Amino acid sequence: MKDLKHLLYFENLLQNANNELIEQAKKDGKICAAFTCENIPEPLMNLGNAFSVRLFAPNTGSLDIATYYMTSFLCETSRALLERAIEGGFNFADCLIAADGCTMMNRAAENMEIGRAHV
């Protein structure tokens, strides 16, 4: 039971995409390489002054905005990531890396890039 308090700490980190570990790394001047898929070679993104973060969207409510830009036939995960990106939830990321293995995630990443270009 003593170890459960440590598990709670890590569980709380997962409540926000931009958690205290990411904020500390950014304060230390590190570059955040955000990625969308487990097929990305994560060790290669953690070289030098970079650190990697797999994007996720905890506590997502409505997907209305993302569904406007992407069809409702695409998976909820890709739409949730786009919804969170539109809300500004991934502004901590310095770059976005998306694998070419999933058309739905590619579509979400393309919309994120288009949205960022207009900001």
Language-model-detected regions and their locations in the chain:
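An N-terminal assembly and electron-transfer interface module characteristic of large anaerobic redox
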Residues: 1-118
